[in-house]
């Protein structure tokens, strides 16, 4: 990957990390939509790059939200510990067990578009639930629901932020406290994923030519997330999730439309054999004795076969 492309993706990471629109969808879809030639990329290395962007965003959140974090730590108790632990265990277990199969089978544009649509539908449904609770009343069951949501967000397009916001609203929390819960439970998972990928990268080694893109992308992700902190308050103020659901559906529609057009062009290219007039019939039908496009059977050859 070129450093310039890493910088573009790092700049996208900040706002998409703070909004429930799935940064995990934007990172692979942008190169695909704009036509960057990444066919020879290593999937494991690509995923490590994405996690490095998440790590940059997490570092920016630790700085930008330090007052909120300090307040949480001052009031930390056994109940909050149980909520945090139960929100961490499902994504940790599923990540260790299913990370590689998910990367191999669910990393394509089609599965990402499906994830975007599924997340959008869940957000619209959750928005209709009553929202009366505050985070001070969160229980172990709430922590487990948030953990299962984060486990589901391992699939591209679902969005960790969107999944936890949806789960919190489904459990009846207000939009402000849903956002606070979402950010609180996400940080340990992001940091844990970054550590896991860091250990794997250390074992296999980072290619020399990839060090500059990794550094540039991580630094840009940190800066863009730090500069986008106002988006957190935007999500807190919004009374509905449907605008984000509409954006996700629009992006998914764009991806599905391009997939359909590509398949249509491919099908057309295979269904346009050369049409020639048969000397025997003169009716302009295909004269391809073996069914292959553009091959013409001679009358002599036909007589030899029939004899």
Regions flagged by a language model, labelled:
Residues 1-307:
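Multi-pass membrane proteins that catalyze or facilitate reactions on polyprenyl-/lipid-phosphate substrates
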């Amino acid at each position: 990957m070129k450093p310039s492309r890493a910088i573009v993706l790092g700049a996208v990471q900040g706002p998409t990390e703070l909004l429930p629109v799935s940064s995990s969808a934007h990172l692979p879809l942008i190169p695909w939509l704009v036509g960057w030639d990444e066919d020879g990329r290593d999937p494991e290395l690509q995923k490590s790059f994405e996690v490095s962007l998440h790590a940059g965003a997490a570092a920016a959140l630790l700085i930008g939200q330090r007052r909120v974090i300090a307040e949480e730590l001052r009031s930390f108790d056994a109940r909050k510990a149980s909520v945090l632990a139960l929100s961490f265990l499902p994504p940790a277990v599923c990540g260790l067990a299913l990370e590689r199969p998910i990367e191999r089978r669910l990393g394509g544009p089609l599965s990402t578009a499906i994830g975007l649509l599924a997340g959008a539908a869940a957000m619209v449904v959750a928005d209709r639930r009553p929202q009366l609770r505050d985070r001070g009343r969160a229980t172990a069951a709430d922590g487990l629901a948030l953990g299962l949501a984060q486990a589901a967000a391992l699939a591209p397009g679902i969005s960790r932020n969107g999944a936890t916001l949806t789960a919190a609203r489904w459990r009846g929390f207000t939009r402000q406290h849903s956002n606070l819960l979402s950010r609180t439970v996400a940080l340990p998972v992001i940091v844990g994923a970054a550590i896991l990928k860091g250990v794997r990268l250390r074992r296999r080694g980072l290619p020399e030519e990839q060090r500059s893109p990794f550094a540039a992308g991580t630094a840009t992700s940190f800066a863009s997330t730090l500069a986008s902190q106002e988006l957190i308050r935007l999500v807190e103020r919004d009374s509905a999730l449907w605008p984000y659901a509409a954006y996700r559906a629009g992006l998914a529609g764009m991806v599905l439309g391009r997939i359909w057009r590509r398949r249509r062009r491919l099908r057309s290219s295979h269904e346009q054999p050369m049409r020639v007039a048969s000397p025997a019939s003169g009716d302009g039908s295909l004269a391809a004795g073996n069914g292959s496009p553009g091959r013409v059977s001679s009358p002599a050859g036909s007589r030899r076969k029939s004899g």
